[in-house]
Amino acid sequence: MKLAFFPIHGAAMLAIAATILSTAVVQGQPIVPAPDGTGTTVTPSGDRLNITGGKTSRDGANLFHSFQQFGLTEGQLANFISTPAIRNILGRVVGGNPSIINGLIQVIGGNSNLFLINPSGIIFGPNASLNLPAAFTGTTATNIGFDSGLFNVAGANDYITLIGTPNTFYFNLSQPGSILNAGNLAVMPGQSITLISGTVVSTGSLKAPQGNIIVASVPGKNAVRLSQEGHLLSLEIRVIDGELLAQNGQLSLPLSLPQLLAGAGGNSATGISVNGAGEVVLTAGLRVESGDVAIASSTVNSQNATLSAARNLTLVESQLLTENNLYLLAGDTVRVRDGNNAFRAIAGGNLTIQGNQNIDIFALNYPNPAFQSAGDITLLSNGNVSGDAHFAARGNFSILTLSGNGGSFVSLYDPIISSEGDVRFGDYTGTSLKVEAKGAIAAGDITITGPDTTLLGSADPDAAVLSGSAALILRSGVSTLANAANLPPNVTEGETFFASPGVASGNSIGVGAISTAGGPVILESGGDIALDAIATSGGNITLKAASDIAVTGTLQSTGGSVDITAGNLLTVSGTFTDSNGVNASISSANNGTGGGAITIRHAGSTTTPFIVGDATTNGTTGAITSGSETISPQFAVPVPPSTYTQGNIAIVTSAPSTTPQPTPSPTPQPTPSPTPPPTTAPTPAQTPTTNQPTTTKLTTQNKKHK
C-alpha cells in the first residue's frame, strides 16, 4: 500500500458550531432526482425506491445519476438497477443538503461498484446498511476524476467522455463536508469500503472481509488520487489547479459537524455528543475537529485497512482487526483511548502507527495486549510518543522518528513490549518498563521514575516486581514470551503471512545510561550486553549474558546488590568517586555505609584473568567496592581457586560456555507462527504545509512467502 500527501495552499479548518443534539431518532429524507437532464428516475414501490435511467459513458461501463436530495428513513431501500455491462455507478447529490441514510442501499442486475457523492455531507444512521455486489465509496468530494475527463458534482458534464475507473477525488471547498457513520456498513468478501471527506467519524462498523477499508480525511483545496496496480494500492493527495476551480458549478458551503449532527434530527451515534461550547466530543472527552478521523465504539474488520487523518486520528474503545496490514496515520496526532470497553488493534500482517507530530496511547483495559501483529509493529513520530499499552509482535517492534532513527517515548502507567523479532527505540522515561524479545533489544537512555500502577492482580510473572518498585526488565534472545501475541482465528486465517525473523540482528542488548528511582535493573541476554552505565538509587542490579558484558561507564546500586554473570568476559570501563571517596567502577556503597553484596561471574579462565584496574579485556578500570569491602587496582583475581571472596564481594572464574543459552521467560507460551524476511519500513507521510507543496510517499506492499 502506498499513501502519499501533496499539500495544497489555503487549507482551512472546519468551524465547530455551538449546536446541541436533541434526542430524536435519525430521519432520512426522500430520494429526489435532480431536474438537470441527467435522466435519473426514482420509482417508489412501497418502501423500495427503484433507481433507473441516468447517463452512461461511451463504452457503457460507467452509469451516472443526479439527485436533488438523497436519503432513506428506517425500513426504506434505495435500489440501484444495473446491468452486467456497468462497472461503476456514480450518484451525485446537488441540492445542498446532507444525505441522511437510515435504510438499505443495494445494487442489483450487475456487479457494479457504487459511488455516493455529496459535498454537503453524508450521515449513515444506526439502521444504515449495504447490499452490494462490489465496492462502496462514500465521499464529500466536489469532483471525480477519470483518466479521460472530470465528473462535476455541481454543473454540467459530458458523460460520454468519462471512460475508465474513477481515480481522483477533488475537494474544491475550503471546508469539505463531513461523513458520519453510525450504521453497519459491510461489503461482500474481496470488496472494499472507502470513506473520504473533510472529517470522518465512525461509531458504527465497517467490514470488508478479504478486502480493503480506507477511511481518510482531506483538507480543503486538495485532490486525492486512488489507483490499483496489482497488490499495490496508491492514495495520493495533491494540489488543485486554477483551471479546475473555474470548472465548478455553484456549491453550497457544507454544515459544520455539530450542525450536521443536529440536522440528522438527533444524536445518531453512541459515544459522540456536542458539549456546551459547541464542540464535538467523544466519550473519552477528546474533541473532534476539522481534518480529524475519529473511530469511537466502532469495529473495523478487513484484509487491509488504512485510517488516515489530515489532522488527528482518534481511536476510542474500538476493535480494529485486519487479516493483513493495518495503518493508523495522522498528520498531527494519533490518539488511542480505552474506557468502559477495551481498545484492540490486531493485524495479521504489519501494524503501523504514524503520528507525524505525536502519538498518545492509553489502552490498558484489556487483559491481552491491545496492540498485536503477526508481523512488525512500528510507531513513527517526530514528536512525543506516549505508550501506555501492551504491545506484542510476531515480527519486530520499533519506535522510530520519521527519518528512521530511534524514537523516544514515555509512559505514566504500564508499558510492556513483547517481540518475536528485534526491539528498537530511543530514550525512555516513565514507570517500570518490561521488554522481552526473541531477537535483540536496542535502546537509548532509560529512566524509570516509579512503579507501574495498573498491574496489580495481573497474570504477568513479573507483575509483583514491576508494580512494587521502579523496575527495568530487559530480556533478549528468550525462547518463549510471557506476553506473546495471541491472534484470533479471523485474523490469522487470511493470507499466509510470515513476520520478520527474530534472529535477524542476533539476540544481544544494547542500551544507553540506565537510572531507576530505587528499583531493580534486570538485563538478561542470549548474546552480549552493552550499556553506558547503571545507577539504581538502592535497587539491585542483575546482568546476565550468554556472551560478553561491556559497560562503558559505571555500575552504582547505592545499597542494592550487584549480580553479574558473563558467559564470556566482563569489562566496566568508567570510574566515579563513590560516597566513601573510592574511585570505583562498581559500587554498592550506601552513602558512606556498607551496601549490598557484589557477585561477578565470568569465563576468562586462567587465560584471561579478571583484573581490577584494567578493563582492556576482562576487568574494571576502577575499584570494586561494597562500602564495607573494597578490591582496589591493580589486582588480578587469582585462579585457582575458582571463587575469590573478600567480604561480601565474590568473583567467580570459569571456562567459557561452549553453547550459551538465553534465559527463558517464566511462563511458556504456545509455539508462534513462522516468521518471514523483514519488510521495508514505510516512508512516513509528512504534515502538509500551506505554502510549500512537497511530495512524500508512504509505501508498503503485501508480501506473500510460501
Q: Across the structure, where does each feature detected by a protein language model lie?
A:
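Extracellular and secretory-pathway beta-repeat/beta-biased strand scaffolds
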Residues: 2-706
